[in-house]
Amino acid sequence: MSNFGVIKRDGSRAEFEIQRIINAIKKAASAVNISDEFYCHQIGQEVGNEIFTRHQGEIDINQIQKIVEDKLMASRYPEVARAYIEYRHDRDLAREKRSQLTKEIEGLIEQSNVELLNENANKDAKVIPTQRDLLAGIVAKHYAKHNILPRDVVEAHEKGEIHYHDLDYAPFFPMFNCMLVDLEGMLSRGFKMGNAEIEPPKSIGTATAVTAQIIAQVASHIYGGTTINRIDEVLSPYVQISYEKHLKHAQEWNVPDVEGYAKALIEKECFDAFQSLEYEVNTLHTSNGQTPFVTFGFGLGTSWQSRLIQQAILKNRIRGLGKNHKTPVFPKLVFTIKKGLNQNKGDPNYDIKQLALECASKRMYPDILNYDQVVKVTGSFKAPMGCRSFLGAYEEKGHEIHDGRNNLGVVSLNLPRIALESKNEEDFYRTLDERLAIAKKALMTRIARLENTKARVAPILYMEGACGVRLKADENVAQIFKNGRASISLGYIGIHETINALYNKGHIFDDEQLREKGIAIVRHLSEAVKRWQKETGYAFSLYSTPSENLCDRFCRLDTKKFGVIEGVTDKGYYTNSYHLDVEKKVNPYDKLDFEMTYPPLASGGFICYGEYPNIQHNLKALEDVWDYSYDRVPYYGTNTPIDECYECGFTGEFECTSKGFVCPKCGNHDSTKVSVTRRVCGYLGSPDARPFNAGKQEEVKRRVKHL
């Protein structure tokens, strides 16, 4: 019987030992002053016989305890049974107090778990709604790890070999990651939200107000980013409706310049509508305990109505929020540049590009999408979902479909860990393939969790049009994720550290051979997801993980296992996906050339960016970099110092220390009297108010300028 197994409370398997049962019975007997060695052994043997007779190969620990209780209750010493049950109850309580679940809950209540509190720079863990969400996340994560996910997937996650993203939401809940909302379909056809039947809007002000409500509802039903794709074109009909109202009123009142009057009013109404939308987004709290992580894609509209929306979005962002004109973190703005439309002087929308440059120099956003490169890399044009997740091309009935599609989730690989474990390159790729197998298994659990989900769990998504469909309450939602309509992504982190650990022969930027080695690793990952797509029919994609929290977590776990290793674990963070080491001093053009090879391989998610000094008075320099990027990368972001001190009036770059941010002029570090804005990964954060985790803070501190 030595091979008979016991399934412990954490799901692990141990060898059955009858002596442990006998010892527990002895303790219970001793507690009620009964000394009967034969009795204890006899009950132990009876328990063992029943286990071996009725169970094949293994038994759950709780089943064993139930059998022991039944045998004791039927014995000549029922008081021993009572003592055993009380003893077990006390042990259960003590065990519960020592459990990881209890420790994490206490860390939240006592505000002592810094890792949890600073995990997401968009969540203010000091306020009750966020704490409630974090508490739910702790429980959901615990349940998923113990009752839903396969044991080997959980172990790989716990060890830091992979990272199962957003475990605090899915797979406990049948939720997905990020999406492009079908705003056009919802507004044009109407929909129901809560108790209200929403009809098509009759003005741009109403359209933006409804858009804000849609964003809040959608963001509460998913755990990733919410993107409104081509918002300037989607909302342009409502600008026209408002304009026609103003024309009609002018005619009714015999206004001399009817068109001039209507144009003046619609410009004001459009500006106010998007100002309200920006304020709504930044004052809303979703049920996820955070401001909606929302992205607006715009810039391709050519009508005067679309141009007016583009101008309103950018002018409102330049103006800022509130009396101090603070830089808003959301919505993330993504402006599209296209040859013949707005790239060069003489293009009809070149003036909008100039406004976008001014805005980026003052507010960091907008990031830019280079139209031709987005099409080349992803197969069609669309904005990113959230900060960097991109969908591939997909058609229905001969028409390209983008809006209403989504990403089902991400599992990321710890590449530096594999390099640290490997003796040579051959060993690295052998282990990488093993980790790829477990990552695929983990990703398939995301698909499986959604297979029998009914539309009624998220009416806004599946019944009212956000996902581009109007299913009935009892219809399964899995059908809309198949055949490439939704993506599901393999992520990765730390190409820089992986190359250092594996080859230890200099900086990847300076060595052409090392560059090829880094590209080869990502190509290997890209080939793997293509195979998975053929095997399953689902649109697996390779995603360059933003790693806001992961840069810290993976490095921390690897330091614990391997120690401090120069060039790998010594910084306290891992470099974001394929990005150039943040400490490497190069110009923005060379940085673009270094990174441009990766997005075509990792077409499911990417961004490139540059670090700049204050360039508000040198927009030509920024435009030159934007233009250089056009034929090289699909997606580019501008990081520039825009911090403000409300004590002394300083504007520029605050000093970044391991403990926070300090005004270089007056030393002010009061978070209520400063505005500090930094790019976290693909999106911005306000680390003065909501601190980064230790690894991300260190990474931000080490960033050097590229111009």
UniProtKB/Swiss-Prot annotation:
Documented EC number(s): 1.1.98.6
- MF (Gene Ontology): ATP binding; metal ion binding; ribonucleoside-triphosphate reductase (thioredoxin) activity
Where Zn(2+) binds, per the record, is at: C645, C648, C663, C666
InterPro entries the record matches: ATP-cone_dom (IPR005144), Form_AcTrfase_GR_CS (IPR019777), Gly_radical (IPR001150), NrdD (IPR012833)
UniProt domain ATP-cone: residue ranges: 4-95
Q: How is its activity regulated?
A: Activated under anaerobic conditions by NrdG, a tightly associated activase. Activation involves the formation of a glycyl radical at Gly-682.
**Sorted UniProt keywords:** ATP-binding, Metal-binding, Nucleotide-binding, Organic radical, Oxidoreductase, Zinc
Q: Which residues form the Glycine radical domain?
A: 584-707
* Transmembrane annotation, as ranges: none
Record's catalysed reaction(s): a ribonucleoside 5'-triphosphate + formate + H(+) = a 2'-deoxyribonucleoside 5'-triphosphate + CO2 + H2O
UniProt-listed Pfam families = ATP-cone, NRDD
Q: Which domain of life is it from?
A: Bacteria
**Which terms under GO biological process does the entry name?**
2'-deoxyribonucleotide biosynthetic process; DNA replication
Q: What GO CC annotations are associated with the protein?
A: anaerobic ribonucleoside-triphosphate reductase complex
Q: At what positions is Glycine radical found?
A: G682
For this chain, the family text in UniProt reads: Belongs to the anaerobic ribonucleoside-triphosphate reductase family.
Question: Quaternary form?
Answer: Forms a tetramer composed of two NrdD and two NrdG subunits.
According to its UniProt entry, the function of this protein is described as:
Catalyzes the conversion of ribonucleotides into deoxyribonucleotides, which are required for DNA synthesis and repair.
The protein here is known as: Anaerobic ribonucleoside-triphosphate reductase
